[in-house]
């Protein structure tokens, strides 16, 4: 039996997930994350609102994708392709109520290498850092 390295799936390439519990209720987190200011924090500037299943987007930095599914106050699943990348990755934003607030989770799969996995881990951690600052400074 061959064991795969952490993060390597059988058929979806490499994957990574990053989460943090923020001191905010799920509804308020959802409203902020899908607002123009919130979308700019995690997806990029220029994303059309409101997000709806099936729409395509292109951010001001050239990242493109399509909203695959959207379950209000729960999750958004989308394709994500930054400039220079040859294929889409899949990104999920998942919210879950906790005793101390809202767990915000970003999950990426269809990554091409362990190096890309680590880069995405750093990217999503940075996003969560910025969201934490925005929420704690009452920008929501």
What kind of feature is each model-predicted range?
Residues 1-48:
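Hydrophobic ligand-binding cavity/cleft-lining segments
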Residues 4, 133-140:
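Short, highly charged C-terminal tails/helix-capping segments
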Residues 13-19, 62, 75, 90, ...:
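Intrinsic-disorder/low-complexity, polar/charged segments enriched in Ser/Thr/Lys/Arg/Asp/Glu/Gln
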Residues 17-23, 58, 66, 94:
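Generic structural detector for well-ordered beta-strands
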Residues 26-27, 68-73, 95-103:
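A short, structured loop/turn motif at beta-sheet edges
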Residues 34-84, 90:
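Glycine-rich portal/gate segments that line the openings of hydrophobic small-molecule binding cavities
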Residues 38-41, 48-52, 110, 126, ...:
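Structured surface interface patches that mediate subunit assembly and partner/cofactor docking
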Residues 77-79, 83-133:
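Beta-strand/loop substructures that line and gate deep hydrophobic ligand-binding cavities in soluble
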